[in-house]
Amino acid sequence: MSLIVIIDGHTHRYADEVIADPVKFALSQKESHWLKLVTPTQGKGLQGWSDRKEMLSQMKTDGVDRAILQGWYWENPTSCVLQNEWHAKWIRQDPQNFIGFVSIHPSIKDPLDELKRRQDQGFSGIGECHPWVQGSTLRDEIWMQCMHFAERAGWPVTFHVTEPVGHDYPGRVSTPFDDFLWLAQEIPTLKIILAHAGGLFPFYELNPKVRPDLQNVFYDLAACPLLYEPQVYRQLIDVVGYEKIIWGTDYPLRIMPKTQEKPDFASFKNLLHNEAKLSSKEASAIFGGNILSILP
């Protein structure tokens, strides 16, 4: 398989002090929701941790050229600004490897100023967003101002999507499908990325009354091996087209815990390629071309 560039469209990275003691960080920042997700209730948890050296080494080993650093949907607006500072440092430090997305909260002081500041620092999108965890909704006026900013900047916006039925886990918060359709209708030129296979939202594109409104909606595959059977990948491609699918791992999550001792990129890359029986054209698009095409 010969590709020009391979990009993981959905990763997370944390500062060294967070990796050293995530519980201390969560308690000091009042991030109870995040803490539920990253600390195991029993046994070895799914959450892995990776500093700069480890992440770059794993990317090199697994043949990943670049990674999008998604922000988190923090409950505390100061945590969003703090993460944006981390991302600003990291994309300045390793611009050839990392692409920064902005973490946003409706209660940040002057959120549009925060977005403009990060745009000037070289950020390329907003995400990962989950307004409902932050006590808001996508239809909130401040959220919509941020969405219009992204549209004008040519930025994609990544949303966490929770499937409406199925998995239950600590910290699960619903993400209404209606709101994503509404957003696509309100700002049709906004590039929207629905994470985690969109919680299977893309299958609504089989509805001819819905599909025309979703031309700028894309779907990343972050954490999908944890969620769905492997035939879902080819089915997604057949329904929406390979041009709308973005490979992402949710690194450093261990998304294939039965085979992964530590987080990596190659496990899911190989699974996707083999299970979906990707052509070279499909692989080139899904593993990098599609996300590149919607970055500013």
Question: Could you say what each language-model-derived stretch is?
Answer:
Residues 2-9, 16-61, 65-66, 234, ...:
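Mid-to-C-terminal alpha-helical segments outside catalytic/metal-binding sites
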Residues 10, 59, 87, 118, ...:
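Conserved, mostly hydrophobic/aromatic
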Residues 12-17, 74-77, 106-110, 133-134, ...:
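Active-site environment of divalent metal-dependent phosphoester hydrolases
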Residues 40-46, 129-137, 222:
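The substrate-binding groove and active-site-proximal loops of carbohydrate-active enzymes
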Residues 41-44, 76-78, 164-174, 256-263:
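Short, flexible/disordered intra-domain loops and linkers
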Residues 54-58, 83-90, 114-118, 142-146, ...:
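A general structural detector for well-ordered alpha-helical segments in enzyme core domains, enriched
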Residues 65-165, 169-171, 218:
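Active-site gating/metal-coordination segments in enzymes
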Residues 124-125, 137-247:
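Catalytic pocket-lining loop regions of alpha/beta-barrel enzymes
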